[in-house]
Amino acid sequence: MSDTGSARSGDDASDLGAGDLANRLLAASELHGDFLLSSGLRSSVYFDKFRFLTEPELLRATAHAVAGVVPDGVTHLAAPEGAATLLVAAVALETGLPLAVVRKEPKAYGTMSRVEGQAPAGAEVALIEDVSTTGHQVLKAAKALEAEGCRIGIIVLAIDRGGAAHLRDAGYRVKSVVEVQPAD
């Protein structure tokens, strides 16, 4: 990685050869410039999730690493609406677990549900996110799943740029494939 930050493989993911995966994820997605993040923060480093989520071999390797940290007892997978749905679908193919998508807001038509797919009350869910800076979107998704009667067994972040700490502070178990500590 460049001199603007540092990266390391997440705890359990390193057992799955994630050191190489971390380098591949960062090489594919790390951009430099002046970026406005979805959190409202500005950064000179941006991780473009679509650069690894749309490359089949890298998506497969990332899904394998994420699947490797999903603990026994998890019965379902979920992801916040958006690009993370690509990753959660790939993880579902790796694990055979059913999945759900958590909308930001329920649609005004169809089922009008905030949680779409497979996440029944009582499900033990692994909530999966692609890149997290503040953890805000994942936290909202976790709360929506809990409101439906699900339990969050673990939150797994492909690239953590600080969100894991906030999620742990909120009481969640969190694992990351890659942890990035940007300098700005």
Q: Which residues does each PLM region occupy?
A:
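Short helix-loop-beta connector
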Residues: 71-75, 120-122
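Short, glycine/charge-rich flexible loops or terminal/linker lids adjacent to PRPP-binding catalytic cores
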Residues: 85-129, 133-139
